Amino acid sequence: MQLLSPAFAYGAPIPKKYTCQGAGISPPLTFVDVPGAAQSLALIVEDPDVPKEIRSDGLWIHWIVYNLSTTITNLAEGAEIFAVQGLNTSGKPVYEGPCPPDKQHRYFFTLFALDVVLPEEENVTRDQLYEAMEFHIIEQAELMGTYEKS
């Protein structure tokens, strides 16, 4: 399975339009070779480079989406999501564009193929989603982009 974006390659800068300095819309994503046994998909976008004085765990969650249909092969930029969105670190169930406070940060987009459709819960956090996905991840794929404020 692969997670790709026509907007940026793995390790490349994320275009400004997908950040807090632009429109702040979600980037286009493409899902390739999703396993046939998958019953649903989940997506987590996170920044592990947050200064410890801002977040003690050094992690900022930008987007959580789960129970995406396995028939979906892509998400257009700024796409309306027909799945469940969990809470980002700001406490909102939406995409929050990169907005590093200090230097260039890495942003990991991780796609999970699951062997179940997860129970739909309100206000799911990253940790709760990982707990729900435990023992159900068939495969995962990662796309990493970078961003530094100009």
Swiss-Prot record:
Stored Gene3D superfamilies: PEBP-like (3.90.280.10)
InterPro entries according to UniProt: PEBP, PEBP-like_sf, YbhB_YbcL/LppC-like
Pfam families linked: PBP (PF01161)
SUPFAM superfamilies: PEBP-like
Family named by the database record: Belongs to the UPF0098 family.
The name this protein goes by in its record: UPF0098 protein CPn_0877/CP_0992/CPj0877/CpB0906
Organism listed in the record: Chlamydia pneumoniae (Chlamydophila pneumoniae)
